[in-house]
């Protein structure tokens, strides 16, 4: 008996017939060959596109600096930081490389009288500048008042950060003397005073991992009185 009457929906207009999924052997060979060719060609083209270009040759530039009172004529790679120029070219290794990211202050030097993290600036940006490093502040026979104060108050332990601490301290007293306010300066009209809060705020960019901060503060306060007198 026919079931056509029981399932009239099978005769609806527009009902799709099943697709013919049969595949001849010839068609299978064609598809396999095309797939294999794609697998061979595509990785090679991707590899060729990913090969980096040759690194350009470094650009060398003449540079004149006045470092610790002495004029230096240099030829430096334009990508070289001031820190590396001081240490590698001029062998002034008193300036330390700490974090190399401008976060610790160990590389602080004075550039035209203002403190600067030498690891964050390119040497060629300071053509003709006057640079003072820890070696230029004083000598063993004639210490700068700040150097003498750090020794007197034991403002260090391992000593790695000390050159940056001292250079920054000298600049801090100069900033206060020049009337430059800080974030903790209460009266912006009057000249800032050399208070403990002012010193702590201004020295906050110089990290001492040994924790000699109390002695560093005492040294700066002592040197401030010595320099004023």
UniProtKB/Swiss-Prot annotation:
Single GO biological process annotation from the record: cellular detoxification of aldehyde
Signal peptide: 1-53
Needed co-factor(s): [2Fe-2S] cluster
Annotated 2Fe-2S ferredoxin-type domain residues: 61-137
UniProt EC number: 1.2.99.6
Binding, [2Fe-2S] cluster 2: 158, 161, 208, 210
A GO CC term assigned to this protein in UniProt: outer membrane-bounded periplasmic space
GO molecular function, one term: metal ion binding
Annotated knockout phenotype: Mutation results in complete impairment of cell growth in the presence of cinnamaldehyde.
UniProt cofactor note: Binds 2 [2Fe-2S] clusters.
Location of this chain's protein in the cell: Periplasm
Post-translational modification, as annotated: Exported by the Tat system. The position of the signal peptide cleavage has not been experimentally proven.
Catalytic reaction annotation: an aldehyde + A + H2O = a carboxylate + AH2 + H(+)
Region Disordered, annotated ranges: 1-21
Domain of life (superkingdom): Bacteria
Cited InterPro entries: 2Fe-2S-bd, 2Fe-2S-bd_dom_sf, 2Fe-2S_ferredoxin-like_sf, 2Fe-2S_ferredoxin-type, 2Fe2S_fd_BS, Aldehyde_Oxdr_Iron-Sulfur, Beta-grasp_dom_sf, TAT_signal
Keywords carried by this UniProt record: 2Fe-2S, Iron, Iron-sulfur, Metal-binding, Oxidoreductase, Periplasm, Signal
Regulation of activity: The complex requires PaoD for activity.
Stretches with biased composition (Basic and acidic residues): 9-21
Function as written in the Swiss-Prot or TrEMBL entry: Oxidizes aldehydes to the corresponding carboxylic acids with a preference for aromatic aldehydes. It might play a role in the detoxification of aldehydes to avoid cell damage.
Record note on quaternary structure: Heterotrimer composed of PaoA, PaoB and PaoC.
Name of the protein: Aldehyde oxidoreductase iron-sulfur-binding subunit PaoA
């Amino acid at each position: 008996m026919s079931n056509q009457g029981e399932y009239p929906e099978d005769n609806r207009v527009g009902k799709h017939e099943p697709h013919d999924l049969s595949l001849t052997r010839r068609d299978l060979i064609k598809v396999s060959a095309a797939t294999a060719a794609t697998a061979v060609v595509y990785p090679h083209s991707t590899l060729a596109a990913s090969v980096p270009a040759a690194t350009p040759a470094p650009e060398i530039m003449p540079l004149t600096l006045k470092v610790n009172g002495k004029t230096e004529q240099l030829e430096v790679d334009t990508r070289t930081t001031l820190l590396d120029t001081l240490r590698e070219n001029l062998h002034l290794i008193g300036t330390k490389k700490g974090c190399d990211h401008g976060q610790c202050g160990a590389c602080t030097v004075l550039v035209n009288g203002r403190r600067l993290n030498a690891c964050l600036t390119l040497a060629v940006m300071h053509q003709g500048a006057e640079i003072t490093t820890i070696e230029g502040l004083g000598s063993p026979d004639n210490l700068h008042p700040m150097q003498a104060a750090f020794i007197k108050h034991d403002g260090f332990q391992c000593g790695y950060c000390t050159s940056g601490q001292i250079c920054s301290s000298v600049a801090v007293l100069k900033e206060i003397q020049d009337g430059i306010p800080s974030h903790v300066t209460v009266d912006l009209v009057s000249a800032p005073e050399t208070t403990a809060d002012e010193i702590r705020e201004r020295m906050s960019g110089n990290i001492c991992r040994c924790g000699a901060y109390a002695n560093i503060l005492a040294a700066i306060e002592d040197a401030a009185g010595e320099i004023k007198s």
